[in-house]
Amino acid sequence: MKYILIIGDGMADNPVERLGGRTPLQAANIPTINFMAARGTVGHVVTCPKPYPAGSEIAILSIMGCDPRKYFNGRSPMEAAASGIHLQHGDVAYRCNIIGLEDSDAPYDELKIVSHSAGSIAGEDALEVVRILQEDPEFSAAMQAAGMVIYPHPVFRQIVVQANGDVDGLKLIPPHDHLGEAAGQHMPSGNDNAAVIDNLMRLAHKVLKDHPFNQARRAAGKIPANGIWLWAYGMATELPSFEGQYGHTGGVISGVALVHGIGALRGLEMIQVPGATGEIDTNFEGKMQATVDLLRTDADFCCLHLEAPDECTHNGDLPGKIQAIEWLDSRLIKPIFEQLDTDGTDYRVLLISDHKTLTATRGHDGDPVPFLLYEKGKDTGFGGVFNEDTGMAGPEVPAGHDLLEYLFGTKSV
């Protein structure tokens, strides 16, 4: 038996007026998912227990079998683990987004956060932004004085590590939760280190806003990459062995460092797929084949994560969100099943949205999310479809960190 955990990041939503009161899941054409739903079990679960905010760092840690109340120590250490960055005692890791602020000569505090990702900047463009900052004497000196180092990545998601960083009382705000709002309303606060981070963010804008790199982006009709935003700090994190907890081995397939990092800290293989971007242009076929190839080995577990529905929602792209959900069905799940069926492989599936990402706000929501359990060749007689309404009408799993026990069959709904 093979076990497949499929996470459609942020695909659950609330009813959308533009869709006639339907959710994107209800509007999407997902025949393979609904085939599973009709023969499986559809229920609901809270993946982000209070008092934690709704976010993938809590939700996916929970879905992957770790109670966040026991194991969560910040988002960025898990992202750092995906890059092989090992935090020392006293080190603090931060997520550092390359962002797009309003293209205006207004004071920094009045500039609106236009894009949490500078228009999904990636590749050499993302690396160039980091190079520009590192080569600027004033910014470089401020980083050195703060005891900070930035680790470049070819996406908008960067990692900054600070030696002996003071996070007692520090408050940092996720930029994707405040799109369209003035930056000055959400700057770091809470302690002296907040002023250090505040200064770095303002310096970055000063360096980047009129740089020839951004002049070229404007000329090309792209969102200027004219700022950075530090958030999601955390200290060194240790997670229990996945094999030790469940007796299963396998890997994680994702275009997002957070998910790979959680897998790595649990002793799972991080499977890198070329072109897996964490956006709707991700390499669907590569991720699909990597899943099949993994399950053709002695490994019996695969976590397949698709970030695209979440990013489309943050970007205000409702058609893109629906398209991403449909491609999850047609370009990932359907061909995976076809190849496993040809191989004669038995499999069980857990499909879930890690959290809701709301079209109305372009932000996350901590309401219960639907999940689907399916086993090849079995028929529960449910006869329904997979969406938020059928999930809420179905059984409740008490805690997100128990979900994998239902996938592995050690618990039943």
List the model feature ranges, each with a label.
Residues 1-413:
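Feature captures the catalytic ectodomains and active-site-proximal regions of enzymes
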